[in-house]
Amino acid sequence: MRVVIQRVSHASVTIEGVCKSAIKEGFMILVGIEEADTQEDADWLCKKIIGLRVFDDENGVMNKSILEVGGNILVISQFTLHASTKKGNRPSYIRAAKHDVAIPLYNYFCQELSIGLGKEVGTGEFGADMKVELLNNGPVTICMDTKNKE
């Protein structure tokens, strides 16, 4: 699993002209799922995301987690995170999981984030054409990949 985490002042996702989810301060997370990804990968990411200390403390130092600031999370499925650009100019998405693998794992990931956060996370709609708006705060953008746990 691969995620791009952006610290935001606010974010929203619109599908067919209707706002599906909107959040205030927190994380907007793009998540890409591969065929070989598992619930253990999702669990590892959730633990890291919930504990990630990238919000300012009273001294302006990034030292607080999303739990400590009462932040929110918006999760957007993003198969293009697994694009391969080695050959030619048209990306290949062969590494991205098919719907029958990706949807249950995406739902599990969102559910586990909700449990860790103690409140519902906002989501997009898997496979939909979405319009995502966000105000990146910092900017702070962090990438994580369960195949490269650094």
Curated annotation (Swiss-Prot):
InterPro entries: Daa-tRNA_deacyls_DTD (IPR003732), DTD-like_sf (IPR023509). Gene3D superfamilies: D-tyrosyl-tRNA(Tyr) deacylase. The gene is dtd. Pfam families: Tyr_Deacylase (PF02580). Keywords: Cytoplasm, Hydrolase, RNA-binding, tRNA-binding. It comes from the Bacteria. One of its GO terms (cellular component) is cytoplasm. It is an enzyme of class 3 (hydrolase). The keyword Cytoplasm applies. It is found in: Cytoplasm. NCBIfam families: D-aminoacyl-tRNA deacylase. This is D-aminoacyl-tRNA deacylase. An aminoacyl-tRNA editing enzyme that deacylates mischarged D-aminoacyl-tRNAs. Also deacylates mischarged glycyl-tRNA(Ala), protecting cells against glycine mischarging by AlaRS. Acts via tRNA-based rather than protein-based catalysis; rejects L-amino acids rather than detecting D-amino acids in the active site. By recycling D-aminoacyl-tRNA to D-amino acids and free tRNA molecules, this enzyme counteracts the toxicity associated with the formation of D-aminoacyl-tRNA entities in vivo and helps enforce protein L-homochirality. Belongs to the DTD family. A motif (Gly-cisPro motif, important for rejection of L-amino acids) lies at residues 138-139. It catalyses: glycyl-tRNA(Ala) + H2O = tRNA(Ala) + glycine + H(+); a D-aminoacyl-tRNA + H2O = a tRNA + a D-alpha-amino acid + H(+). The lineage of its organism: Bacteria, Pseudomonadati, Bacteroidota, Bacteroidia, Bacteroidales. Homodimer.
